[in-house]
From Swiss-Prot:
InterPro entries: Kelch-typ_b-propeller, KLHDC3-like
Source species taxonomy: Eukaryota, Metazoa, Chordata, Craniata, Vertebrata
SUPFAM superfamilies named among the record's database cross-references: Kelch motif
Kelch repeat start-end pairs: 25-77, 88-138, 139-189, 191-249, 251-301
Protein name listed in UniProt: Kelch domain-containing protein 3
GO biological process, one term: protein ubiquitination
Gene Ontology cellular-component annotations: chromatin; Cul2-RING ubiquitin ligase complex; cytoplasm; cytosol; nucleoplasm
Length: 382
């Protein structure tokens, strides 16, 4: 029984950020917020959400170990990717408006909170943003995105073998997925499932004739082939900048945006890779408003979803030119316990808590007390 259980405001106000879950903590890296200064080159920021205390913290800026020498830290960016391998977060790609796109690989040690740049070899992917990254074992797969130097969408797959730190451009077999950016790629078993994103009628070149494909594409990492997939009778609308995650061998997507429909989404869909069917899911409780460019991480049996951007309430669900960036966080529980359901009842009906144990009252307070680290809200125009 899926249920939205927590809704808190006041976290980092972020759009097109990237995040990973490490135990009961979620690490969020970079992104942007309308109205902030992005002309000045500065370090990427790191926010940590504790899924037990339901509190956000922000790591302090990194100081250089050598006087007069800048520390090894990625610059502030958006449209990048992060994955977790062992105790290391690998951050790749993304761009900002001053430096453009980047193809330097950065590594962040979650134990020491230190950055470093691993020495890599092989065919390094071109700098880009809006790509996807997912992991199978020790290998990170990068697909798609918008390449800066070529000035076009990509449908290449690169892999980084982290045991040797070697990049390889995969010569794929089969009919490849279309060139795209701001799609999702999710690893289920040895197969990578690609959904959505923004493509163009002119193939790799951007002409503002956008396509929002809603067919799922599957890449087999063992044979390095794109698979021929059967038709599916029920499909979500095509979209970009949505969230996707795998849970119990199935793929879920949430939210996103379709410019051709001029519409933001807040729907939740489940894809079963065995039957190759989609099903719309209706969780209990109050979920997030329609949005795109949010982040989503799995912590145990819970989904932590935060940030993103939505149309201003005065503008309806589709207007591109007046967007509100979010500082909120939502938790979707796949298997809420009786204890959780009881706490939700206490909150919903405003029941007396004075007779409850201290730890329960502490948990209720955490579930209803907003964070306080977000900056004031600013509308985004354009």
């Amino acid at each position: 029984m899926l249920r939205w259980t927590v809704h808190l405001e006041g976290g980092p106000r972020r759009v097109n950020h990237a995040a990973v879950a490490v135990g009961h903590r979620v690490y969020s890296f970079g992104g942007y917020c309308s109205g902030e200064d992005y002309e000045t080159l500065r370090q990427i920021d790191v926010h940590i959400f504790n899924a037990v205390s339901l509190r956000w913290t922000k790591l302090p800026p990194v100081k250089s170990a050598i006087r007069g020498q800048a520390p090894v830290v990625p610059y502030m960016r958006y449209g990048h990717s992060t994955v977790l391998i062992d105790d290391t977060v690998l951050l790749w790609g993304g761009r900002n408006d001053t430096e453009g796109a980047c193809n330097v690989l950065y590594a962040f040690d979650v134990n020491t909170h230190k950055w470093f740049t691993p020495r890599v070899s092989g065919t390094v992917p071109g700098a880009r943003d809006g790509h996807s990254a997912c992991v199978l074992g020790k290998i990170m797969y990068i697909f798609g995105g918008y390449e800066q130097q070529a000035d076009c969408f990509s449908n290449d797959i690169h892999k980084l073998d982290t045991s040797t730190m070697t990049w390889t451009l995969i010569c794929t077999k089969g009919s490849p997925a279309r060139w795209r950016d701001f799609h999702s790629a999710t690893m289920l078993g040895s197969h990578m499932y690609v959904f959505g994103g923004r493509a163009d009628r002119f193939g790799p070149f951007h002409s503002n004739n956008e396509i929002y494909c809603n067919r799922i594409r599957v890449f087999d990492t063992r044979t390095e082939a794109w698979l021929d997939c059967p038709p599916t009778p029920v499909l979500p609308e095509g979209r970009r900048s949505h969230s996707a995650f795998g849970y119990n061998g199935e793929l879920y997507i949430f939210g996103g945006y379709n410019a051709r429909l001029n519409r933001h989404f807040h729907d939740l869909w489940k894809f079963n890779p065995v039957s190759f069917t989609w099903k719309k899911i209706e969780p209990k409780g109050k979920g997030p408003c329609p949005r795109r460019r949010q982040c989503c991480c799995i912590v145990g049996d819970k989904i932590v979803l935060f940030g993103g951007t939505s149309p201003s309430p005065e503008e309806g669900l589709g207007d591109e030119f007046d967007l509100i960036d979010h500082s909120d966080l939502h938790i979707l529980d796949f298997s809420p316990s009786l204890k959780t359901l009881c706490k939700l009842a206490v909150i919903q009906y405003n029941l007396d808590q004075s007779c409850l144990p201290h730890d329960i009252r502490w948990e209720l307070n955490a579930m209803t007390t907003n964070s306080n680290i977000s900056r004031p809200i600013v509308s985004s125009h354009g």
